[in-house]
């Protein structure tokens, strides 16, 4: 995999009209484009189709978490929109993950989100998940892979432990990456792009450091050069 192919640019914008100039600029420099909740809530499948027209696979990051039947239907609809990857919460349980895989079909890779990168140990303890984040992440990753997930989403702090737990097959997608010196924002468990890849990440998700850069394409090239 070329370094640029490891970068997923997050289209964190309120509308596709706002996202499109950025997406067109970075698409030649990255491997994937991510449509998240904000953009999908505003425009639905049209946002996925618009991003796909730019020639890169689309990562639809909805983090589905509902009863299995509902998630299966949502995954089927996501596949019909043209998404290549789709996220669900591993905490929804093994049957929910299996339902998502059935609904998505063979053309869409279902990724299971373990623990959000905005949560630290204190935040996890407050919601009843006592102990280090790594333990929860590894437990959820194993559950999801056994249930058929094609990949795992985890922070750069846990990616090495997840790789050791699930083996070489699943795609490991890592948000919460920030170039050296960049602001952390609302992320609690972060690392640089190079650190994440060295730890075992296949794909890194980059949002604000690209979106807020004066020249997003140049920023993407700089990240790729450091991988």
From Swiss-Prot:
Pathway participation: Pyrimidine metabolism; UMP biosynthesis via de novo pathway; UMP from orotate: step 2/2
Highest rank taxon of the organism: Bacteria
Q: Which GO terms describe its cellular component?
A: cytosol
A Gene Ontology biological process annotation? Answer: 'de novo' pyrimidine nucleobase biosynthetic process
Quote the PROSITE patterns the UniProt record gives: OMPDECASE (PS00156)
Give TM regions.
Answer: none
Tell whether Hydrolase is among the UniProt keywords.
no
Residues that coordinate or bind substrate: 12, 34, 61-70, 117, 178, 187, 207-208
Supply the InterPro entries for this chain: Aldolase_TIM (IPR013785), OMPdecase (IPR014732), OMPdecase_AS (IPR018089), OMPdecase_bac (IPR047596), OMPdeCOase_dom (IPR001754), RibuloseP-bd_barrel (IPR011060)
Q: What keywords appear on the UniProt entry?
A: Decarboxylase, Lyase, Pyrimidine biosynthesis
Q: What is its EC number?
A: 4.1.1.23
Q: Provide any one GO MF term from the record.
A: orotidine-5'-phosphate decarboxylase activity
Q: Which reaction does it catalyse?
A: orotidine 5'-phosphate + H(+) = UMP + CO2
Which residues catalyse the reaction? 63 (proton donor)
Q: What class of enzyme is it?
A: lyase
Q: Which cysteines are joined by disulfide bonds?
A: none
HAMAP family linked to this entry: OMPdecase_type1_B
Function in brief: Catalyzes the decarboxylation of orotidine 5'-monophosphate (OMP) to uridine 5'-monophosphate (UMP).
Q: Which family does it belong to?
A: Belongs to the OMP decarboxylase family. Type 1 subfamily.
Q: Tell me, how does this one assemble?
A: Homodimer.
Q: What is this protein called?
A: Orotidine 5'-phosphate decarboxylase
């Amino acid at each position: 995999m070329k370094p640029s192919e490891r970068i997923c640019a997050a289209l964190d914008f309120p509308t596709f009209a706002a996202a499109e100039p950025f997406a067109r600029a970075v698409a030649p420099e990255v491997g994937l484009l991510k449509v998240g909740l904000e953009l999908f809530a505003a425009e639905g499948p049209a946002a996925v189709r618009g991003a796909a027209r730019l020639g890169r696979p689309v990562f639809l990051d909805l983090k589905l978490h509902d009863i299995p039947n509902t998630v299966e239907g949502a995954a089927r609809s996501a596949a019909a929109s043209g998404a290549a990857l789709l996220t669900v919460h591993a905490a929804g349980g093994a049957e929910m993950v299996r339902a998502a895989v059935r609904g998505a079909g063979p053309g869409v890779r279902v990724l299971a989100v373990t623990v959000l990168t905005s949560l630290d140990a204190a935040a996890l303890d407050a919601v009843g998940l006592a102990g280090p984040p790594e333990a929860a992440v590894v437990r959820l990753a194993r559950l999801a892979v056994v249930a058929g997930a094609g990949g795992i989403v985890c922070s750069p702090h846990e990616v090495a432990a997840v790789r050791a737990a699930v083996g070489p097959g699943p795609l490991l997608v890592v948000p919460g990456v920030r170039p050296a010196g960049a602001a952390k924002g609302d992320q609690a468990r972060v690392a640089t792009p190079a650190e994440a890849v060295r730890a075992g990440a296949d794909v890194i998700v980059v949002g604000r450091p690209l979106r807020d850069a004066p020249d997003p394409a140049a920023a993407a090239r700089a990240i790729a050069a450091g991988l």
